Amino acid sequence: MGVKSVRFSIWFLFVVTDLVFCRTLSGDPDPCDATNQREFQKLRSDQITVLINGYSEYRIPLLQTIVASYSSSSIVSSILVLWGNPSTPDQLLDQLYQNLTQYSPGSASISLIQQSSSSLNARFLPRSSVDTRAVLICDDDVEIDQRSLEFAFSVWKSNPDRLVGTFVRSHGFDLQGKEWIYTVHPDKYSIVLTKFMMMKQDYLFEYSCKGGVEMEEMRMIVDQMRNCEDILMNFVAADRLRAGPIMVGAERVRDWGDARNEEVEERVRDVGLSSRRVEHRKRRGNCIREFHRVMGKMPLMYSYGKVVNSVGEQGLCRKAGKLVFCDRD
């Protein structure tokens, strides 16, 4: 083999490796450059890109497990770990990068992107490396089974303009206080959380690059509150579509960050803002009121029920002295 051939082989190996496993600082130079945006119809429709937000060093072992799970799914094209803690030592990120590449069993490409700031808005930046129509926005403390992931994707493909997720909340209007609030209703919802939020890639550009002065002010509110980027994305999607999100049922979703966990290490469980529930709900209510003030309207719309991946008998029959579903023995 000649010198030119050897050089070509080394260059080719480097490029292929960089495509599969990549650690970079920040992202695209100008994520809002419209010339970098691909036409929706030319993007892959058979797979998704997973964007995982990471911040806490205590959650790194859990993050590695979650990335490995996503990478083993055949519907995942690539995984971008968006590290939002600027104070994390480079040595620790280097080790994380090595572990992600070494212990992730699937064929999905994996990138570790060190964000230039801790802004929660950065998780919605358009990224030129994303080559799929659908993106999954998720947190570093939620683990979902593969069948439920695939089912959520199938629901999204039938409703590509809607936000699809497994965790939902709602806005409401407090008649006594005469103000908008953040709440939970037992029979309706209007907000999908970024614990698991599937959506079309176009919404990244819509959130980060459009909307003019109004949208810029609302993104500033997210930075000031250090919260509510998911609520703002729901405002963006609902305002564009005039429809609410879709909740999908899941067989198994482990939420390690839920404050109600009893046997999870505190440093892992209590990292998230949602662990401080009363304060968290008030702050998010403030966000809803501020977004409403800036927009001059309330675009959020209610959805009812959830989509499930199985259809069983609903009729009841008496068997062995008990009322049970008729298709059960």
Swiss-Prot record:
InterPro entries: GT64, GT64_dom, Nucleotide-diphossugar_trans. Residues 1-27 form the signal peptide. One of its GO terms (cellular component) is membrane. It comes from the Eukaryota. The active site is at D230. Mn(2+) binds at D141. Its EC number is 2.4.1.-. Substrate binds at residues 118-123, 139-141, 169, 226-230, 271-284. Pathway: Protein modification; protein glycosylation. It is an enzyme of class 2 (transferase). Its cofactor is Mn(2+). Glycans are attached at N99. Keywords: Disulfide bond, Glycoprotein, Manganese, Metal-binding, Signal, Transferase. One of its GO terms (biological process) is protein glycosylation. Disulfide bonds join C228-C287. Residues 268-284 are annotated as: Substrate binding. One of its GO terms (molecular function) is metal ion binding. Belongs to the glycosyltransferase 64 family. Probable glycosyltransferase. This is Glycosyltransferase family protein 64 C3.
